[in-house]
Regions:
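Conserved S-adenosyl-L-methionine
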Residues: 72-74
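N-terminal strand-loop-strand
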Residues: 1-36, 65-66
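Charged phosphate-binding loop/patch that engages nucleotide di/tri-phosphates or the phosphate backbone
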Residues: 136-162
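Short, hydrophobic/amphipathic alpha-helical patches that form generic packing surfaces
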Residues: 128-136
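Intrinsic-disorder/low-complexity loop/linker signature
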Residues: 3, 82-83, 152
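Unchanged
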Residues: 41-68, 77-129, 159-162
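Short beta-strand element of the conserved SAM-dependent methyltransferase core
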Residues: 11-13, 91-94, 147
């Protein structure tokens, strides 16, 4: 292990009982699959995951924080893959009533998925386990969770400031 890091962000936007997914194609990191809207940090964002996800959201779907309510970072995960540590910062937010996504997404196809069946879709390993945890537990709390990916899933724990 030589210390290579790959920090990434994603936001999962909800609207009622639906969640916005991006079927991403052409990624340098994962094969075509469903994920949240987001991407890699720019150098000036390395200490600001929120700035990264807001930039990615504006670029990919044309939305800003003013179009959402209750946007919060809810998960930070780590995974060792291909000799690098992948750091994922996952945000969740609710789309404000009346706001629509009108910008075509150049990263793939957008889909509003039912939360009851979202886990049936092909997703990156860590994203699937994060969404599974969110749907079972995370959406009912205001906690920030840390997760470490293993061969059998992701081990989550609430993060606490002390």
């Amino acid at each position: 292990m030589d210390g290579k890091l790959r920090p990434m962000t994603a936001v999962y936007i909800t609207s009622g009982k639906k969640i916005l997914l991006l079927y991403r194609v052409g990624s340098r990191v994962v094969e075509p699959s469903f994920c949240g809207v987001g991407g890699h940090f720019e150098k000036d964002e390395l200490c600001d995951a929120r700035a990264c996800v807001l930039r990615e959201m504006r670029e990919e779907i044309g939305l800003g924080e003013e179009d959402l309510c209750d946007m919060k970072m809810r998960y930070v995960t780590l995974r060792l893959k291909n000799g690098e540590i992948r750091q994922n910062y996952y945000f969740f937010a609710e789309l404000l009533p009346g706001v629509q996504i009108t910008k075509p997404c150049c990263e793939g196809c957008l889909e509003w998925a039912d939360m009851d069946s979202v886990l049936e879709r092909k997703m990156p390993h860590t994203a699937w386990y994060m969404l599974d945890h969110y749907l079972r537990e995370g959406r009912y709390t205001d906690l920030l969770y840390g997760g470490v990916t293993t061969g059998k899933g992701v081990v989550f724990t609430p993060m606490q400031e002390f």
